[in-house]
């Protein structure tokens, strides 16, 4: 094979990028062990110049378009950070390492070689989803480490930044720094942006930009959107993206309006009331649970407006966009709700049942415990709010660290179940719960088929659900075991923290701030994989095609 000039240039570029990545790592090591060296600053300036040269080369070679400018936006942002923000060498060098790794992955050294890494990634939607979340967390961590992101005198460590960025992007709500006092307005806006991106999904937002720019969604992007949104078909995917954006903005603005008038009545000034209203509205709809108050929403336990607005936003964000679209279509066409899709019927019915059961359980369990001394109205508010938020939101109006054992157990179950497919929440999802329960009931009754609302559930779906639940339980059990090894906390608190992270809930029994570095890393993994999904992970690292070319002889085994 004759090596072309382009191949030589690409190989040379890979060598240069590799050298720069290694040198960056070495300089960061020197920085961490407090060795002051003027070479570090000089190298940072050279790196900025090279990055400017790289951007200019790309634009001159390919031409200037809106899409290409959007693709180069992270590079442009970090050039300004490197030039304008003081004490940003460490952050900029972290960005360069990540940028160079991405460049190495994107380089197509062997143009005629099939099975390139980039092709395998781009042809596998689950892998793309995982990588987009990963790089969003990476960029968010860098931004949160900037001096401008924290108040004067405070410092955000690398692990703390990764933890916070992961929690925001995966819409969890577990924190190692108090959001309202540790971070500046800039840092809080970074967190809010990560929440919105993580809640809607990176692919949803990028697809929305593509539609705005007048581009058509490719089959590959439609496949990714189908995976992210929970749609059962690829039909009308452009309208789905539009509806997701419109519904999100409408509901968040509506929730923010209700919260704004409530905060104004609490002696907030206009700007503060507006900002707090928008922040908590977005956080609630995205099921994130981030609050600007150190006690979450405990101060508003008896406030009807805030309880109503927050819980409504959480529920709407948790049922999923396909269900909201189905409800909208049903109302618009003035047809019976019996015409809803099977998916919508399962989600709505299971949500109502779980909310009702959760409210009753918390009302009984905390009657003489955390709610002792409350009047009936406050008990109902607190019980209902706890039932709603435990399923993935993470806000709280009562002290979660003082929950009774019964409430802790019930919370663990609700957190593991989580929200619904295509929603902003996590967990194994309500549809999985219903399918498993109905399948077990059908087996006990001797029924061959699994039927829900007079519709048969395919065997393929049942196998996927079983795989999802099994993978979730196995992964969660492993992470709990590791947490118990590295942390001194009680079994109850450790299990609660792990399930909360995996279900992207954000409730804690007060141990998050005291976690060791190893414990924080485990929680980060739980939050990330809890949001991406165990089943997505399984599909991402293995071929999904059936490779069974023959079958073995069947033989019975003893069970029980």
Where are these predicted regions, by residue range?
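Membrane-proximal intracellular helices of multi-pass ion channels
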Residues: 1-560
